[in-house]
């Protein structure tokens, strides 16, 4: 892709060679590409990404303004795929595509686009994409360049006919039905950036210190290779540890394929001493415990570098740990999940803001967006929060007379409880006996402390 973009637009990928090699390594770890001397059967990268993704969206709910609700619904439909792409490659782009009354979204993996420019914060100022098309037995290459500018987004599109593996001659966009409606150059005023929302992992670049985002397991990539080598050694140990029969040369004979085997009746009439027949059985001792102990050390180190709590990749430690150690491990995991949830919320806000800007360009009425007001995301209780324990504490306070039951119920059912009318409504709907006992005009005490205020 890099050479094609350079030939077509005179601008190549700004990603460093070290970073490109690291991206290939992350993808190989995730997709289980075998390396010499390694066994990728464990697929630790897949396990890490799937665990994080499931936890991030375990209790996820989202709401937005009615005009953008179809677009948010389409965005939520691809949230898992987009999050996984971002965790694997460090960055994932979300491309809005006009569909009906809103927009659909297409997640773009890190190795499927080329950054042509970045600002000081790592945001894309130019990006190139490539698509291979087939028509009438011929291959075509559709190249697109997006450039951010003060006047808006500029999109340049060029179509080339492939000449084998090389970029051939340029042909008009009207050559193919799929590209006939495209324009060679298009300016979208009012559209910020490159017209693509970005999901970027919150990790600092540990590869070359550049502006590119890194995979969530990038710090643990070396340990994952060590685990793969250890798995390969363990497999070899088991294969080489099979029992072997050593027999004298005169007891072997060749079959019709040239393979040397023992005689069929060799084991029929063995005397008491096998040495008299020239046969020795050897069963080597396997080093299973040493291999497993080393593997657990590697997995625990991976958990520390990724930000997992103990027991997600490794086995739960048999030895008891102090409360401080347990709290530290779970606290790190909670922070990891919160950072990824903030990453998605920021990316979703970018996507909906982009939909509103594109809606104005396309003449779609009523599309406006304010991330602080129009987008609400509920992530549930979180990793560390124990709802049952908190409810029991509130009930204990109610029993002791330290907390009004209306406030406890308001917290449990997430009901408004700011004034007397709202508390009276809670009594009427959830505490019928108390509502009957209390006078209808009973004035609530002022200065009540709200839960969660």
Region roles according to the model:
Residues 93-209:
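Extended, regular secondary-structure scaffolds
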């Amino acid at each position: 892709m890099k050479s094609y973009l350079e030939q077509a637009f005179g601008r190549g990928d700004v990603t460093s060679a070290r970073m490109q090699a690291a991206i290939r390594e992350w993808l190989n770890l995730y997709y289980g590409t075998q390396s010499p001397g390694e066994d990728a059967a464990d697929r630790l990268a897949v396990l890490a990404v799937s665990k994080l993704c499931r936890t991030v969206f375990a209790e996820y709910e989202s709401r937005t303004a009615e005009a953008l609700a179809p677009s948010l619904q389409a965005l939520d439909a691809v949230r898992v795929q987009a999050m996984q792409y971002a965790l694997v490659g460090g960055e994932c782009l979300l491309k809005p595509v006009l569909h009906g009354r809103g927009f659909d979204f297409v997640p773009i993996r890190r190795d499927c686009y080329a950054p042509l420019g970045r600002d000081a914060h790592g945001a894309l100022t130019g990006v190139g994409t490539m698509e291979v098309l087939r028509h009438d037995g011929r291959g075509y290459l559709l190249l697109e360049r997006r450039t951010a500018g003060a006047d808006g987004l500029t999109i340049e599109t060029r179509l080339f006919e492939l000449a084998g593996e090389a970029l051939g001659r340029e042909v008009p966009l009207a050559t193919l039905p799929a590209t006939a409606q495209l324009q060679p150059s298009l300016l979208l005023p009012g559209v910020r950036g490159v017209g693509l929302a970005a999901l970027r992992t919150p990790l600092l670049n540990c590869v070359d210190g550049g502006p590119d985002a890194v995979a969530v397991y990038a710090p643990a990539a070396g340990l994952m290779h060590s685990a793969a080598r250890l798995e390969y050694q363990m497999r070899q140990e088991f294969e080489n540890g099979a029992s072997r029969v050593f027999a004298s040369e005169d007891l072997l004979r060749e079959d019709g394929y040239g393979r040397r085997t023992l005689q069929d009746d060799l084991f029929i009439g063995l005397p008491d001493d096998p040495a008299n027949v020239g046969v020795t059985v050897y069963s080597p001792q396997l080093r299973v415990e040493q291999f497993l102990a080393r593997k657990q050390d590697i997995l625990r180190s991976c958990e520390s570098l990724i930000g997992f709590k103990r027991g997600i990749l490794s086995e739960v430690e048999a030895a008891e740990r102090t409360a401080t150690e347990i709290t530290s491990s779970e606290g790190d995991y909670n922070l990891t999940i919160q950072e990824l949830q903030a990453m998605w919320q920021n990316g979703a806000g970018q996507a909906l803001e982009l939909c509103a800007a594109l809606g104005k360009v396309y003449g779609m009425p009523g599309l406006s967006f304010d991330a602080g007001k129009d987008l609400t995301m509920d992530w549930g209780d979180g990793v560390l929060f124990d709802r049952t324990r908190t409810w029991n504490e509130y009930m204990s306070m109610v029993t002791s007379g330290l907390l009004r039951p209306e406030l406890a119920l308001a917290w449990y059912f997430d009901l408004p409880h700011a004034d007397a009318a709202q508390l009276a409504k809670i009594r009427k709907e959830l505490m019928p006996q108390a509502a009957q006992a209390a006078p209808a005009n009973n004035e609530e005490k002022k200065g009540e402390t709200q839960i969660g205020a």
